[in-house]
């Protein structure tokens, strides 16, 4: 097996594209939405070698690492991956791998999704070309104040499929349907030369979940404080 790894590495792009093509005969792949993310792997060695470079380890290890970028389809099934030097900025890993998907996988019309760390201006611009679009997570804390104020304003939300506006303060969150509904609002913004739309979502169910998590954290903190006081 180990002796075959060098051969597999050389033919990796071909193997991935053929696996994707043939997997469609077993289960038609949902390529309307593609998810992309990166991770890294560390090596217990003392010096850099090849792709193994000192970089920002997700496990905060002081060892050389390599970075892996992975695309998944809308069903969460892996499509394509590639390995990059551990000291390479993750944002720059997207374009070469996505270009392979465009060229070798026959995918040209999809919505690209990633977290904020991979949503550079260059990556967003690349995914606004031709028949592609993108959805990138965005931190409220990093928004402009005027946009953040609009996002946090409880008015002008909608339900999916409805055009009428909703004031979140009027919701009866004890109602099961209301509790399980996700509400949203759209905020048009201009980022440099790009026209974009910020989509703000509100979920009573997720709010209840986060409230429960915070309550448990507060309870644990209080127990730790009480225990510390007793030891004194």
Outline where the language-model segments fall.
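Anion-binding and metal-coordination hotspots
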Residues: 1-232
């Amino acid at each position: 097996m180990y002796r075959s790894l060098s051969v597999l590495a050389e033919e990796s792009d071909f193997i991935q594209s053929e696996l994707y093509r043939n997997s469609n005969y077993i289960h038609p792949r949902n390529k309307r939405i593609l998810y992309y993310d990166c991770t890294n792997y560390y090596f217990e060695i003392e010096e850099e070698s090849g792709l193994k470079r000192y970089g920002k380890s997700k496990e905060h290890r002081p060892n050389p690492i390599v970075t892996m970028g992975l695309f998944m389809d809308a069903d969460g099934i892996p499509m394509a991956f590639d390995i990059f030097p551990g000291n390479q900025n993750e944002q720059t890993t997207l374009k070469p791998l996505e270009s392979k998907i465009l060229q070798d996988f026959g995918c040209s019309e999809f919505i690209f999704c990633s977290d904020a760390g991979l949503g550079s201006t260059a990556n967003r611009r690349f995914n606004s070309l031709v028949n592609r679009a993108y959805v990138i997570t965005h931190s409220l804390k990093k928004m402009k104040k005027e946009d953040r104020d609009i996002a946090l304003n409880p008015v002008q939300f909608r339900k999916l499929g409805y055009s009428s506006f909703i004031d979140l303060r009027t919701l009866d969150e004890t109602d099961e349907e209301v509790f399980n509904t996700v509400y949203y609002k759209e905020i048009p913004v201009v980022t440099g030369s790009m026209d974009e739309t910020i989509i703000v979502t509100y979920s009573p169910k997720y709010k209840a979940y986060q409230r429960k998590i915070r309550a448990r954290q507060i309870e644990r903190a209080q127990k730790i404080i009480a225990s510390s006081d007793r030891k004194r």
